[in-house]
Amino acid sequence: MKLNRLTQSFILLALSSLLLLFFSSCKEDQKNFKTIEITFKKEGELSLFKAETDSLIAKYHIEIAETDYERQRGLMDRTSMKDDQAMLFIFPDVRMRSFYMKNTYIALDIIYIDDANKIVSIQKNAKPLNETSLPSKAPAKYVLEIKGGLSAQLGIAEGDRIDFSKSRNQ
């Protein structure tokens, strides 16, 4: 059976229209999705003390990361942090630690602390989104993350110590 040119054109147009309709229905709706800001959750307080004088250097409201999931997430996907806020990572054992800045948008000072609450090393001004390993110089049980540049500004050094308490509702 031979189709004339007009019929062929009509069939081609109909098939093209059906394909266009099919592919446009597969397209996702253009909705405005809002990014949910991860907010700081105060779960305790931490104080930093100078090694030589035992004088108070700074006080922080802390969010605590002590489950595997919390330690893995850390401050990832956060876009801001106040100077008096910090995250304290609590590990079940003392050993060499290493952190990196994957999916972390805030420059941080990463402070490694032993089981006697003494600072054993500091990685200053870790660059956002950088996946380079930032190891401790000595075994650590705790890791404190504060806003980048604060350890230099406040004179926080190896040998200084911390004291912290969890909030009662923890």
Label each PLM-derived region with a short phrase.
Residues L21-S25:
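C-terminal motif of bacterial Sec signal peptides marking the signal peptidase cleavage site
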Residues K27-Q170:
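Compact, glycine-rich, soluble single-domain proteins
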Residues K2-A14:
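Bacterial N-terminal signal peptides that target proteins for export
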